[in-house]
A protein has these predicted regions:
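N-terminal presequence-like segments and the immediate start of the first folded domain
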Residues: 1-56, 60-73, 79-129
Length: 129
């Protein structure tokens, strides 16, 4: 997997890459939207707790396929409240630890549960060999 930012496009406005090249044969994991819910179904109380829970959930999904955060090729982050962006980005950076997948950020009017503040879906890729 190779991250790149073409010279003919303005540089990234955050911690992401404009493109991710994945060569075959690769194993792919398409992660459904993860939210800030623990294994008992309890929703985190605030954006910080929900963000940490969802990144732990992503780690668990990836581990189920023998992958890790650095295998994420693309992610989409959905936020309900614009004022939560700073905390959500800070925690995202903590978990990505310098990894720069292709990324999209969306602000939405709401998510599937009225108490959810954030959701992240992703695609991960790892060599089959």
């Amino acid at each position: 997997m190779r991250a790149f930012n073409p010279a003919g496009v303005a540089g990234p406005f955050g911690s992401y890459s404009h493109g991710i090249e994945v060569e075959s044969p690769m194993r792919l994991v398409f992660g459904s939207g993860q939210t800030g819910v623990d294994t008992d179904g309890r929703i985190g109380e605030d954006i910080e707790e929900q963000s940490r829970l969802l990144w732990r959930n992503i780690q668990e999904v990836l581990a189920g396929a023998g992958m890790k955060i650095s295998d994420i090729a693309q992610l989409t982050m959905l936020l309900v409240r614009r004022e939560d962006l700073g905390i959500a980005r800070e925690i995202r950076e903590e978990y990505l630890d310098g990894h720069r997948p292709a990324s999209t950020l969306l602000f939405v009017a709401g998510l599937a549960h009225p108490d959810w503040l954030i959701e992240v879906d992703f695609v991960a890729a790892r060599s089959s060999g």
